[in-house]
């Protein structure tokens, strides 16, 4: 019933485009015209669908491959080798879009250099009550309080196993897969939840992300404390190292932007001490920067998009310095242009991710970011994107 409702709303959107212009509009959709998506299609869909329904429809369309053709062809200039893998380009999709591993292949088709699914919890759970996601179009931002809604490890394992051989080939070709792990809301042993995630999905992932930074699960961010984090990550690494065979996925930790200087020093210390493979910097913020215009700006939840962009970039800069540039960083938060991506890379990120930008600009934003990034790299005298990693620290 829910899918039929979404399908009907999508059909209504097509009708609104107008009979005479339908053919031309269809052409613009299929070819991924950036201006058409940003100025017409996405605003129209936002007017018809609430944010969560639009999200579900986007995942469904992506899973079916109903996407515009990726127009930008990745050049060798954008290739990155990090975390034990080749990345065809440094722009990935952040966790939260494909929570349940339903649309991985469609996301690669969209032009992403890597895909991160999740968060996935051990047992299925509904998450927080609806409504739980809110657009702030005036601010190019979104607030969400999904609360780790998840189909659970068993269902996601089945989906990933069905495409395991395909993913192995994609990874070899420079398109790795990450899985973001979370804990169940009612769990009394968080470390065991993450360990179970490693055991079940570790053999199917190139990277595992320990998400201890979502603001929408009570007590989760407390796991970023030094003692708690050391205990948790020690168990995660033990489980990872105990996986059968030669497959050893990289382990990364995703941290919040709302950290004190001491918090960041403690995280860097634990990461270096234990030999964690990488950091994802940052998750959504619970802060509300001055100047937000959206009517729903006071809703509870994590804020993503343009407003926390600079906070994310500064956190990348700090974590790069605290780890002496020896721990690869994936930068996420407010990326919607090549300039945004390059700022994070120069601050210390080896790779970047986006998600909220899809809400406002649609699939063509992926090619736009890559095209602009390549142009800026050339303009600033870099031969390869890897030459720009941490460049601000060498000035």
From Swiss-Prot:
The active site is at residue 214. The chain crosses the membrane at residues 11-30. It catalyses: (S)-dihydroorotate + a quinone = orotate + a quinol. Residues 1-10 form a transit peptide. Disulfide bonds: none annotated. FMN binds at residues 95-99, 119, 180, 211, 254, 282, 305, 334, 355-356. InterPro entries: Aldolase_TIM (IPR013785), DHO_dehydrogenase (IPR050074), Dihydroorotate_DH_2 (IPR005719), Dihydroorotate_DH_cat (IPR005720), Dihydroorotate_DH_CS (IPR001295). Its EC number is 1.3.5.2. It holds the Pfam family DHO_dh. Residues 31-395 are mitochondrial intermembrane. It is found in: Mitochondrion inner membrane. Binds 1 FMN per subunit. Residues 1-10 are mitochondrial matrix. It is a single-pass membrane protein. The keyword Nucleus does not apply. This is Dihydroorotate dehydrogenase (quinone), mitochondrial. It comes from Pongo abelii (Sumatran orangutan).
